[in-house]
Amino acid sequence: MPADYTSTARALSLPMSPAESLSPAEEDTQPLWSHLASSRRNTASPSARESTGLRDQVVNQATKMLRRTKKTWRRLTFWQRIGAIGAALLAILLGLAFMIFTGQVFFWLGPVAEKWEQSWLAFFVLWLCVFFVSFPPLVGWSTFGTIAGFIFGIWKGWILYATATVLGSTCSFIVSRTILSKFVNRMMERDKRFAALALTLKYDGLKLLCMIRLCPLPYSVCNGAVSTFPTVHPLMYGLATALITPKLLVPAFIGSRIRILSEKNEEMSAGSKAVNICSIILTIGIGIFTGWYIYRRTLARAKELEAKERADIRRSLQADHAAHHPHGSFSEDPDVNTAATTLARDEEERIGFNDFDDDNVDLVIDDESGSENSPNLTKKQFQGPYRDEFTDNDSDVFGDGDGPDSQMFRLHTHVRSG
């Protein structure tokens, strides 16, 4: 009994931090459950730790999103909440209707697909459909690509789909940029994340644009969103869209397989049906995996470029402040300079000093008489570093006596880069 009591007391008195290692004598006196717990912690597999870390990240992201949603919901008025609920219900109904329509459209096209395959009018009408769904917030781009493969086959359908996509996305980009020009300017001046993403497209813009186009993002919404970045030019965006057109073979191929299954269902053997169905599933799986992988790589590349841009701006800020002269422009391109200036303000806040010496303030302290004509607060430009010695233009504070009734004290703090 005394031995058990002593070992239990020692175990309870041990510190919670596992940083310090115990001697063999102390380990022998520890109770059995402490050895079991420590062995379980030490034998945890790396895969278990990775799964725990991934699960924690998912939980944290979900928690942040829930908090943000609740915060936004509290700010809404009564009628805004009614409108939000109505919009959500409408979106759900439209999504269900679109899924039902997509499933039925191939049954409707089955009897006329062979006749429309040789019709240039049908080709042109479907081309216009793909072209116009490039404008936000229209949907149906992937469905029209599958229909193109269903009616015209994989290669002819791909040509229709690719040409309409390239021209439609470029025109949508230009129109969206024209309409959203005020929004773009406001975002560039206020949102540091938007400015950082705009600057990342300055380095390998074409490569990053191709990666964005390969991501599984809503097509028309992506056209409008990318148009808000002033560092992206319409021709570059059109070229990036043209370079990823081999991706468009996926929906065209799926459409052609669906037509074969619908027309020759009774004639095909079970093995042929299985091959066609497996090819469709495999193609969809490859598309999903590729999109997910490129999406992760795109985010990683964007973060890398943002960190590089911030490091360059930080070095420029520190060099200018060490030399005591204001910052010049970051780029000859006005759009790039605007984005860099927005990012520079954020970096100045992180470093601890401002670009224009906002702390250089002349403070006037009036006497107790309180003259109405005496100013209370003025600002002056910084004229030079602090110095102890006097010049001919400087007055001796001890020789001036008490001075006038209103005295001016200059408050100036300047943070030097370490």
From Swiss-Prot:
Biased composition (Polar residues): 1-10, 371-381
Superkingdom of origin organism: Eukaryota
Main location: Golgi
Membrane-crossing residue ranges in chain numbering: 82-102, 120-140, 158-180, 235-255, 274-294
Region annotation (Disordered) ranges: 1-25, 362-408
Residue ranges annotated as Lumenal topological domain: 1-81, 141-157, 256-273
Start-end of Acidic residues biased regions: 391-403
InterPro entries per UniProt: Golgi_membrane_TVP38/TMEM64, VTT_dom
Residue ranges annotated as Cytoplasmic topological domain: 103-119, 181-234, 295-418
One of the GO BP terms on file: vesicle-mediated transport
Localization in the cell: Golgi apparatus membrane
Keyword Membrane attached: yes
Keyword Translocase (UniProt): no
Alphabetic keyword roster: Golgi apparatus, Membrane, Transmembrane, Transmembrane helix
GO cellular component assignments: Golgi membrane
Purpose: Golgi membrane protein involved in vesicular trafficking and spindle migration.
Domain note: The VTT domain was previously called the SNARE-assoc domain. As there is no evidence that this domain associates with SNARE proteins, it was renamed as VMP1, TMEM41, and TVP38 (VTT) domain.
Protein name: Golgi apparatus membrane protein tvp38
Name of the gene this protein is made from: tvp38
